[in-house]
């Protein structure tokens, strides 16, 4: 980032990578916060901030950022993250709905597969159809 101090994507990528590994979360927060200052409307940076907040145990903030990100761009990866936050809050039906949406857009999504496996969940099917 020394070579490109104005590159919000570099800050975001490093911050997200740290959060994904659940390491150095205060540093991850600072990096993503810097990216968000540079590009406040970027849904992928909002997703990263939501994920950092989730890893830090701030479920209200995590849900807020992830809902905003998903409203801007209904990306499968954002849906997976928001679904995991809802699951952690006990909203299994809400999580399942988002995971179904993610699966509909990208059936081979690795983040969805690994999240479902880690949480011992499977996609619920609508038996009425």
Residue ranges of each PLM-predicted region?
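Canonical tetratricopeptide repeat
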Residues: 13-14, 48, 81-82, 115
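Structural marker of alpha-solenoid helical repeat scaffolds
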Residues: 3-4, 37-38, 71-72, 105
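TPR alpha-solenoid repeat register
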Residues: 10, 45, 78-79, 112
């Amino acid at each position: 980032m020394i070579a490109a101090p104005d590159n919000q994507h570099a800050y975001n990528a490093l911050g997200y990578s740290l959060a994904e590994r659940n390491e150095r979360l205060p540093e991850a927060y600072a990096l993503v916060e810097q990216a968000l200052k540079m590009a406040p409307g970027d849904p992928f940076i909002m997703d990263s901030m939501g994920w950092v907040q989730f890893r830090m145990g701030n479920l209200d903030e995590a849900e807020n950022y992830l809902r905003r990100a998903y409203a801007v761009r209904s990306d499968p990866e954002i849906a997976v993250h928001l679904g995991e936050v809802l699951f952690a809050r006990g909203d299994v039906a809400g999580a399942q709905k988002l995971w179904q949406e993610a699966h509909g857009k990208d059936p081979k999504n690795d983040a969805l597969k690994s999240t479902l496996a880690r949480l011992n969940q499977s996609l619920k099917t609508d038996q009425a159809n």
